[in-house]
Amino acid sequence: NDDGSETREYPEGEVFSHVVGYAAKGKSGLESSQNFNLLTSNAFFLEKLANEFKDQKNTGDTVVTTLDANLQNAAYNALGDNKGAVVVMEPSTGKILAMVSKPSFDPNNVSENWDALNNDENSSLLNRATLGQYTPGSTFKLVTTLAFMRQNPDYNNYSFECNGEFSQNGATIHCYNSTAHGEENLTDSVANSCNSSFSNIGLQLDKAEWRKTAKQMLFNSKLPGDVKYNESSFRLKTDAGDADTMMTAIGQGETQVSPYHMAMLVSAIANGGKLMKPYLVDKITNYAGTTVMKYMPESYKELMTSSEAAQLTEYMKAVVDYGTGAALSGASYTVAGKTGTAEVSEDGNTVHSWFVGFSNVDNPELAISVCVEDADTATITGVSVAKQVFDSYYNN
């Protein structure tokens, strides 16, 4: 500015606010992690010298992100006025293509609105994508399924007769709307998101081995990447009773997870079991556009074998082909995924609606994790948000 002061301008406003962050009142997001690069000038030495003689500032470097503006806008618009988060990753590289959290805020006037933002009961400054901790609901059945596969090599022979509810030692779990799914194998159990079948599966699991599988899926673990996050938690004890065990198997109970973590999990499944380290910065360029630093994809670790990933993909395809994610079938693109409806109130009327999965199943392109808080599922679901994001990518 003319008076020597500096102002940060955010032309994209609320759409990128959590992931880009703000530079006032402390820093957040990329403004925090990339502050050094933004202030460093990789101009040529003689130019820097000339500028100093003229009392002119050297232009700081430019941080080029991995974010796809169209996907970011699509995710932002798809959430509408709902609270929640969307994370989109490229499974083969770990590039974060979109990261949206709502409610949002305008980073252009954080200083002026600081007190109101800090006292906001909707926590609009909170990046729900990485810091939000949610009951995973039926998306956690992917972990339960993997644990069952590992403990039961003959899992293809699994059979269960669902009559809409399952009781054990005084504890009863109901299927959604108490729907009786009839005779099911493991594929059907995942596709129908059958709570009764998964309660039965949970009771058959060795809890210590189950916990081990959950840890390998990054629960109770550090997550890769450079964003601030909260660790997800799997708390089922080895001496837990039947009720807690059944609830945990279907993704209720005390398990907590972030949308960021679930994006990594489905990204690894899409990538043959191998998780690529998530990253947000593609390159750093100087004022002339010359690249001074380029970030390359990095493998983080193998979460599961390629055959386990392929089997989970088959189950997730069934979810879309004839199960709870059928609203995503018949599009110009293919999807494999898992839905979730997490009850978060005593009366069961308040739910978080989830969808996790990936598109272009034979050569995966987009891994997505959606959580809609307190969703009115008559008007919005995790599936409907994911569909809008996929549609914007494949139909434009």
What is the predicted function of each stretch?
Residues 372-385:
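A short acidic/glycine-rich loop-to-helix N-cap element
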Residues 291-296, 384-396:
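Short, gly/Ser/Thr-rich active-site loops of penicillin-recognizing serine hydrolases
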Residues 4, 8-21, 28, 32, ...:
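Solvent-exposed, polar/charged alpha-helical surfaces in well-ordered, non-transmembrane soluble domains
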Residues 92-138, 143-374:
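Beta-lactam-recognizing serine transpeptidase/beta-lactamase-like catalytic domain environment
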Residues 86-91:
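Short hydrophobic alpha-helical segments used for membrane anchoring or interfacial signaling
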Residues 28, 365, 377-379:
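Intrinsically disordered, low-complexity acidic/polar segments
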Residues 1-85, 99-100, 104-128, 133, ...:
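Extracytoplasmic/periplasmic proteins that interact with beta-lactams or build/remodel peptidoglycan
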